[in-house]
Amino acid sequence: MGINRAEQSLVINAPPAACFDAIVDFESYPDWQDAVISAEVLDHYDHGLGRRVQLRVDAKFREVVYTLHYQYERPERLWWDFVEGDGVEHIDGEYVFEPLDGGRRTRATYRLGVDPGVPVPGFIFRKLNDGVMRRSIKDTKAEVERRAGS
């Protein structure tokens, strides 16, 4: 089917470091990321951040389980590549955190590439993917602002 790519951005009322800290707290995802059923850090880098993370996600058209390999440029960016999965052929993406207003706020940009591995009409896949991404970035905004007391 090929990789479908999408992007969502919004402004979060917290500094980039607060955004970064929330998004790398993988094992808390089920508490605040609506689509995430479970998240497990399989191994860590020496600096403590998760290297490989297994996620179980309600992707609306089916439940999928996959492992991603993460890399970091703290606190501006993190990105991931597909390792293996059941219910999906490929996932890659990134979060970029751009400081605004002297670092008091952040423009968060979420980019995602997905190959579901099964034939899904493009317009349906785009609608599902757009909804999942929009929900995910809004969940991120709510959690970061909750943690920051904004």
Describe the predicted segments one by one:
Residues 1-48, 150:
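Hydrophobic ligand-binding cavity/cleft-lining segments
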Residues 5, 11, 79, 96, ...:
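Conserved beta-strand segments that form the floor/walls of ligand-binding pockets within enzyme
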Residues 7-11, 65-69, 92-94:
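Well-ordered beta-strand positions in beta-sheet-rich domains
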Residues 11-15, 56-60, 71-73, 83, ...:
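Solvent-exposed residues in well-ordered beta-strands and their adjoining turns
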Residues 23-26, 36, 53-55, 70, ...:
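Conserved short hydrophobic patches within well-ordered secondary structure
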Residues 30, 40-88, 107, 135-150:
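Glycine-rich portal/gate segments that line the openings of hydrophobic small-molecule binding cavities
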Residues 82-135:
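Beta-strand/loop substructures that line and gate deep hydrophobic ligand-binding cavities in soluble
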